[in-house]
């Protein structure tokens, strides 16, 4: 049977480790997929590469992309704009490839509205103390920003009910293993393969 590409949306509070988990999936080739690189107006963090981690653009360039309907979703978070280029996502899914989006909660909500067939995974910290430790360990945000992110995380965790799966990022290895299990299960989900079998039984 022809296997359709999955749109896998990985989301969760800032500092929960979405980027780290995504990088581990990429590095260890846990399952074959195409990663959709997001666009942002924020400045690169140490070690981040333009075109690999994000497309780093100016606010003017970002607004032009919005005007040209080139983004699947976009929003502003802590003074910076973030968005997902639409064209590459559509092309990869049409080619039957699995696509991974790593986006924030607001972005995931918009994608859910436009592509409800996606698989939505909420990555959550073991607790808020761990989340604070991770944000402090970054060394890139002030105490005021960290407090703001924690307050936002309290609200975002409550929208977990809108997702298909919840994965606790206690360790990166555990989180990656859970995500792989989700992908494997989704590929054999009846709702994803039933149309192929309906076609099969109608054939002569």
From Swiss-Prot:
Q: Does the keyword Kinase apply?
A: yes
Subcellular location(s) per record? Cytoplasm
In alphabetical order, the GO MF annotations are: ATP binding; guanylate kinase activity
Enzyme Commission number, as recorded: 2.7.4.8
Q: Per the database record, which ranges form the Guanylate kinase-like domain?
A: 5-184
Q: Does the keyword Cytoplasm apply?
A: yes
- Family annotation (Pfam families): Guanylate_kin (PF00625)
This protein's major location comes to cytoplasm
Q: Where does ATP bind?
A: 12-19
Q: Which InterPro entries match?
A: GK/Ca_channel_bsu, Guanylate_kin-like_dom, Guanylate_kinase, Guanylate_kinase_CS, P-loop_NTPase
Q: Which Gene3D superfamilies match?
A: Guanylate Kinase phosphate binding domain (3.30.63.10), P-loop containing nucleotide triphosphate hydrolases (3.40.50.300)
**Catalytic activity field:** GMP + ATP = GDP + ADP
Question: GO CC annotations?
Answer: cytosol
Any idea which UniProt keywords this protein has? ATP-binding, Cytoplasm, Kinase, Nucleotide-binding, Transferase
Family membership, please give it.
Answer: Belongs to the guanylate kinase family.
Per the entry, what this protein does is: Essential for recycling GMP and indirectly, cGMP.
Q: Which PANTHER family match?
A: GUANYLATE KINASE, GUANYLATE KINASE-RELATED
Q: By what name is this protein known?
A: Guanylate kinase
| Organism of origin | Lactobacillus delbrueckii subsp. bulgaricus (strain ATCC 11842 / DSM 20081 / BCRC 10696 / JCM 1002 / NBRC 13953 / NCIMB 11778 / NCTC 12712 / WDCM 00102 / Lb 14)
């Amino acid at each position: 049977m022809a296997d359709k590409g999955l749109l896998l949306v990985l989301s969760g509070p800032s500092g929960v480790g979405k980027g780290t988990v995504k990088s581990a999936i990429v590095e260890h080739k846990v399952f074959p997929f195409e990663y959709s690189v997001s666009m942002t107006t924020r400045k690169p963090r140490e070690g981040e590469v333009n075109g690999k981690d994000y497309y780093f653009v100016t606010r003017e360039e970002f607004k032009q992309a919005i005007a040209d309907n080139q983004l699947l979703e976009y929003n502003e978070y802590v003074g910076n704009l973030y968005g997902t280029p639409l064209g590459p996502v559509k092309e990869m899914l049409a080619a039957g490839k699995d696509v991974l989006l790593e986006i924030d909660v607001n972005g995931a909500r918009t994608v859910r509205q436009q592509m409800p067939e996606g698989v939505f995974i909420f990555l959550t910290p073991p607790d808020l103390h761990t989340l604070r430790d991770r944000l402090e360990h970054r060394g890139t945000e002030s105490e005021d920003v960290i407090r703001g992110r924690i307050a936002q995380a309290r609200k975002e965790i409550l929208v977990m009910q809108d997702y298909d799966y919840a994965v606790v990022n206690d360790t990166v290895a555990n989180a990656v293993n859970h995500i792989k299990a989700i992908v494997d299960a989704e590929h054999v989900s009846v709702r994803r393969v039933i149309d192929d079998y309906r076609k099969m039984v109608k054939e002569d």
